[in-house]
């Protein structure tokens, strides 16, 4: 599901150029807090490799007098994330996966509606495996069909608000979930920018245009990964949510190449197994004496990433 929303975010701002991105992330070693035992039970680090491509197949340019410059587009998105976790000293029965692979393919269609509205439809499939091997993909076990229908209101040229429905069969049967979208691109003076996005996780960036080919950004990103697997003969989902804050210099080469580098901290990197049931999605892992929930996660750690994006703008 995450992949399809990532493509929606990109597709709403894409033009006639294809876009390809590659990214490598490193999260340093830190202790793992287990919510059930209320203690640290192990430690670990992680490397995350991501690649994505968004290819517009056909495009009708926006009307010249359209203040929101809304094109009509058909496109295809491909996405892959490969997580390698180096876990140590976890007791038997509490081990986390050492690998997670998420792959997705999505067909998308975007078109303007009336004066301030756009419609976006998406249909795709993704695989969520506990191994970084194509042979670990099994239909009926870790392959999920998904789709989305989102209406976007262009409140202002730099503010978009959307809502709709998302569909997937995570639990073995079709389920409909609400989908929300928000995007803001603003600026004050000639040098400072603000970007806020919310559809595949929260993303906030405060930017400063130091030179024509160099931006500095303070970024905060929330994301995550999943693996559908069997433990003790039962279907379960391993999920990992991440929250990263860092300083990101972004180097630009010409109009179509950007190289972002990020240095900062990983403040949330959870790790939890759930039954593959709808009720389990809302169940607390453990609770404190006052009734508040607590979750298993790695302690804060050093974060470093490097990437390159080609095409797009």
Which residues fall in each region the model found?
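Membrane-embedded beta-strand positions of outer-membrane beta-barrel proteins
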Residues: 22-24, 74-78, 120-123, 161-163, ...
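Transmembrane beta-strand segments that form the barrel wall of outer-membrane beta-barrel proteins
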Residues: 123-129, 158-169, 180-206, 220-222
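Extracellular loop and loop/strand-boundary signature of outer-membrane beta-barrel proteins
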Residues: 34-41, 89-95, 132-137, 166-168, ...
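Outer-membrane beta-barrel "beta-signal"
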Residues: 51, 55, 179-187, 249, ...
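Residues that define the transmembrane beta-barrel architecture of outer-membrane proteins
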Residues: 43-49, 97-103, 139-145, 174-178, ...
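Short glycine/proline- and aromatic-enriched beta-strand/turn motifs that initiate or cap beta-hairpins
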Residues: 19-90, 195, 199, 309-313
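Repeated loop/turn-to-beta-strand initiation elements of outer-membrane beta-barrel proteins
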Residues: 20, 60-63, 115-119, 157-163, ...
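Outer-membrane beta-barrel translocator/channel fold
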Residues: 32, 85-87, 198-279, 289-304
């Amino acid at each position: 599901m995450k992949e399809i929303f990532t493509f929606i975010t990109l597709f709403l701002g894409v033009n006639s150029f294809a876009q390809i991105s590659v990214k490598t992330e490193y999260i340093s070693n830190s202790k793992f807090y287990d919510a059930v035992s209320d203690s640290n039970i192990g430690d670990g680090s992680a490397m995350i490799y991501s690649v994505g491509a968004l290819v517009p197949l056909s495009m009708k340019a926006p009307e010249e007098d359209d203040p929101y410059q809304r094109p009509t587009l058909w496109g295809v998105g491909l996405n892959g994330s490969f997580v390698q976790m180096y876990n140590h000293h976890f007791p038997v029965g509490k081990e986390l996966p050492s690998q997670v692979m998420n792959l997705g393919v999505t067909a998308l269609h975007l078109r303007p509606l009336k004066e301030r509205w756009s419609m976006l439809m998406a249909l795709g499939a993704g695989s969520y495996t506990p191994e970084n091997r194509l042979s670990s993909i099994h239909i009926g076990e870790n392959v999920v069909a998904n789709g989305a229908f989102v209406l976007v209101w262009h409140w202002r040229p730099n503010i978009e608000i959307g809502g709709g429905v998302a569909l997937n069969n995570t639990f073995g049967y079709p389920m409909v979930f609400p989908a929300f979208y928000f995007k803001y691109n603003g600026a004050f003076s000639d040098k400072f920018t603000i970007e806020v996005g919310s559809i595949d996780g929260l993303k906030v960036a405060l930017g400063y245009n130091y030179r024509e080919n160099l931006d500095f950004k303070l970024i905060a990103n929330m994301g995550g990964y999943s693996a559908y697997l069997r433990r003790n003969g039962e279907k379960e989902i391993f999920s990992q949510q991440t929250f990263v804050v860092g300083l990101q210099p972004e180097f630009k080469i010409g109009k179509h190449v950007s190289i972002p580098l990020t240095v900062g901290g990983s403040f949330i990197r959870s790790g939890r197994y759930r039954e593959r049931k709808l009720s389990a999605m809302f169940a607390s892992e453990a609770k404190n004496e006052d009734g508040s929930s607590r979750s298993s996660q790695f302690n804060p750690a050093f974060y470093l990433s490097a990437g390159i994006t080609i095409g797009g703008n």
